[in-house]
């Protein structure tokens, strides 16, 4: 009889949590309080790795500024979280969809139906990283810090000359030695041993939120804390962008709506026009020269 291979995983996320050993004996309210108390430890753990996260952000900014792309690689929960983050960036900031891309072990079908075996395929990770170039940044996400799919993707990315980042829930991951930046969050044992969709997944979501948002802010996709990178293509978006323009300028909704119309729905062009009084072509030229940054365009126009 054929025996399937067995590998004992010693990752911190696989350990039993001494605080939750009696969870199956508790009433609902106490179960929820216990889960909530464990969840509350995650932001503190993420705070400990902010210096490493800052290095990853700076790499992402440099790569996108010079025409490269950011690639996320993950399996299971990690891949789903990465896919969600990449999908949200175009509607939130207006960045082109091919600039930040997610690769999930097993492809699109695995986003809905778990395909646990594919995460063990090193060669599949390498194959999915075939489009990574020396101009790019590859970010691998693996709670255990040892997923072969992610290891394969980062291995192929390194061969291509790309910069590499590893996000794990194991500060001592064996894969860390081969990447430029390791963000190892010490989330510890899960509420349910090995269920990394919980604290480890929460940490990954916080890191992805912070990483992509900081990169977009650094690249000028916001003005102050306002989303100005979105092109208003329907009535709902036009209404939202008019509200943003009134917040940014203090002008009336009518003036902002007219400026947005003249700018063909481009919020950044409309904002530059409203703040400086220049026409649409001048605002568009200034933004192009400033790589889309409203503040940089305003500084340049102030000099002329």
Curated annotation (Swiss-Prot):
Biological processes per GO annotation: amino sugar catabolic process; N-acetylmuramic acid catabolic process; peptidoglycan turnover
UniProtKB keywords: Carbohydrate metabolism, Lyase
Source species, domain of life: Bacteria
Residues of the active site: 88, 119
Catalytic activity, reaction form: N-acetyl-D-muramate 6-phosphate + H2O = N-acetyl-D-glucosamine 6-phosphate + (R)-lactate
InterPro entries per UniProt: Etherase_MurQ (IPR005488), Glucokinase_regulatory_CS (IPR005486), MURQ/GCKR (IPR040190), SIS_dom (IPR001347), SIS_dom_sf (IPR046348), UBA-like_sf (IPR009060)
Binding partners and assembly: Homodimer.
Similarity comment: family membership: Belongs to the GCKR-like family. MurNAc-6-P etherase subfamily.
Name of protein: N-acetylmuramic acid 6-phosphate etherase
Gene name for this UniProt entry: murQ
């Amino acid at each position: 009889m054929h025996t399937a291979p067995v590998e004992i995983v010693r990752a911190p996320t696989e350990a039993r949590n001494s605080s939750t050993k009696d969870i199956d004996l508790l009433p609902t309210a106490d179960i929820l309080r216990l889960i909530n108390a464990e969840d509350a430890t995650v932001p503190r753990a993420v705070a400990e790795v902010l210096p490493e996260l800052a290095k990853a952000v700076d790499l992402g900014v440099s790569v996108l500024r010079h025409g490269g792309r950011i690639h996320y690689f993950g399996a299971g929960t990690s891949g789903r979280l990465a896919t969600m983050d990449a999908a949200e960036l175009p509607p939130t900031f207006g960045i082109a969809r091919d600039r930040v891309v997610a690769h999930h072990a097993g492809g699109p079908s695995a986003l809905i139906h778990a395909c646990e075996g594919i995460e063990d395929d090193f060669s599949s990770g390498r194959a999915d990283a075939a489009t990574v170039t020396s101009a790019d940044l590859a970010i691998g996400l693996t709670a255990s810090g040892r997923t072969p799919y992610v290891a394969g993707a980062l291995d192929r990315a390194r061969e291509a000359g790309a910069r590499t980042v590893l996000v794990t829930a194991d500060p001592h991951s064996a894969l860390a030695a081969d990447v430029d930046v390791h963000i190892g969050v010490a989330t510890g044992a899960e509420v349910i041993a090995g269920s990394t969709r919980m604290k480890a997944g929460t940490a990954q979501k916080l890191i992805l939120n912070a990483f992509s948002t900081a990169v977009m802010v650094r690249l000028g996709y916001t003005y102050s804390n306002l989303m100005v990178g979105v092109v208003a293509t329907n009535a709902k978006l036009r209404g939202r962008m008019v509200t943003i323009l009134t917040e940014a300028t203090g002008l009336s909704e009518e003036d902002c709506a007219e400026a947005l119309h003249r700018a063909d729905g481009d919020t950044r062009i409309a904002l530059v026009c409203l703040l400086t009084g220049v026409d649409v072509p001048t605002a568009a030229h200034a933004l192009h020269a400033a790589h889309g940054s409203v503040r940089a365009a305003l500084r340049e126009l102030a000099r002329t």
